[in-house]
């Protein structure tokens, strides 16, 4: 990766993780899917920080948190046209499930869109008890964007979902409102002719 003209190699990374590609080696093929974290001294957010990967492809920051920048590959129009409906369908099911008290139809609809052997599938399965309390929260999404569609292989793609939401939480003695702004990095894989969500990482500070 090259940031403001300074070339950084994997040896310069302070940490590396597979993130949303954990356990998906069967689908990513030989692609390098590591998320690398670098620490750079004397780098300021103004003027704008620019970066390209070592193949010369420009990457763009989609989230900032304190002194951290999170970069993703820019979207590919062909991939976006093919995969947007997949991402929208999954995230719509996720929003529908997470904004209500536990209800089996919403629960099974969401699980049907997730790779069964993934950590994401296990996470949703374990969420049942917590979701009984979701009826006390009203969620209104004021901004919802699907961006940075990038094909990893013939069987895997990644994108980001950026959103703002007005939340109103209620319990038996009070009501309070707050605004939530976040982004998710999502990975999807193709299995038996169907695209399924396989990874979902929150990106704070979007």
PLM ranges: what are they?
Residues 21-55:
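Short Pro-Gly-centered beta-turn/loop motif in secreted/extracellular proteins
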Residues 20-23, 27, 60-63, 110-119:
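Short, charge-rich amphipathic segments
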Residues 1-12, 16-19, 30-32, 150-206:
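Exposed beta-sheet edge and beta->alpha loop/turn motif
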Residues 140-152:
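Short amphipathic beta-strand and strand-loop transition segments with alternating hydrophobic
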Residues 43-77:
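Structured interaction patches on ligand/partner-binding surfaces of diverse proteins
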Residues 1-35, 67-87:
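Amphipathic alpha-helical assembly segments used for oligomerization, scaffolding, or translocation
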Residues 1, 74-140:
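Core segments of small alpha/beta cavity-forming domains
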